[in-house]
Amino acid sequence: MLYVHPRSNDNKDFSMADPTETAALSVNAPARLHLGFLDLNGELGRTYGSIGLAIDRPSTRVTVHRAARDSARGPESKRALNVIARLRERLGLPGAYDITIERAIPAHAGLGSGTQLALAVATAAMRLGGIARPLDLVGTLTNRGQRSAIGIAAFDHGGFIVDGGKGQSDAPPPVLIQTPLPESWRILLILDPKATGVHGDRETRAFAALPPMERTTAAHLSHLVLMQAAPALMEHDISGFGRAITEIQALVGRHFAPAQNGSAWSEPRVGTLARKLEAGGAVGIGQSSWGPTGFAFVPSQKEADALYHSFVQDAKAQGLELTIAAGRNTGASVEIRTVAETGQ
């Protein structure tokens, strides 16, 4: 049985499976790209405002069973157990759980690994435990969505997403736009397997040390998103979309450069390869979140394949990996295995 959970903003329950009939759940959660912020000025009482999208690879897949005691195996297993402990403390999650992380989005690569793992584990454990909560609340309880709602919205429904930034509420930012990506578009991802982006306490300090963004810059970023990037995407105009994303990335990258050794790229080699892809015909180049993952958009699989074959050896020579992804227009998927199926 394949079950894709409902959108949280439809005010439906987060937990739908009958726990008495369910032996295990497997959750597959998509990575996301964070394409930039709208407002790091904050004069209007809201800060951040994020742009992003769900992609079909890499992804995190976890399988959770009821157990006599908590246990976890696979990458990021300690973080998975921390999610269970937090849900037990804050929601009274009953029982114990055995967690297998079959694959995981690379950690601290700018692809939203922490949010997807937390929501995947929480989805499975809460359904097995018979607890129903809206997805936004689950994000808050697991300390996700503190600045951006892109990861939660990507898990929820996929697509291209714009959120309205953080106000005074503790809840994740409201989602303003969530629309499908054109099915034919492809994204070339530039990965650096040996590097990590700014994260944890260092990330908190970096945000605190950044000066307020100029109001005119924040206004221009909002203008680019509302009047160019979003409508161009909806009209399948990849050139217009790409121009907007490249400019957004340049403006946001300039603002974050003091936290990245004076560069818009956390790994300059990634930026160099992204510019080569752009010269080869790709559009909308940039860095996802704090990186090091870079990206570039093309209109079709054929053009993605051509650029991949032209630059994959260049990437390898620089210690980088080049891969092709597509947008994902659905959220996480949940496979329910019943007691009858497993014999438990």
Residue ranges and their predicted role:
Residues 233-344:
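Glycine-rich, charge-dense phosphate/pyrophosphate-binding loop(s)
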Residues 28, 54, 153-156, 189-193, ...:
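Short beta-strand segments
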Residues 135-185, 271, 285-287, 291, ...:
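Alpha/beta catalytic cores of group-transfer enzymes, especially the acyltransferase/condensing modules
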Residues 93-96, 125-141, 167-173, 302-311:
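Phosphate-handling active-site elements
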Residues 192, 197-265:
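Active-site rim beta-loop-alpha module in soluble metabolic enzymes
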Residues 111-135, 154-166:
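DPxDG-like acidic metal-binding loop motif
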Residues 2-109, 126-133, 146, 329-332, ...:
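ATP-binding N-lobe of GHMP and related small-molecule kinases
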Residues 64-66, 74, 192, 296-300:
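Short beta-strand-to-loop capping motifs
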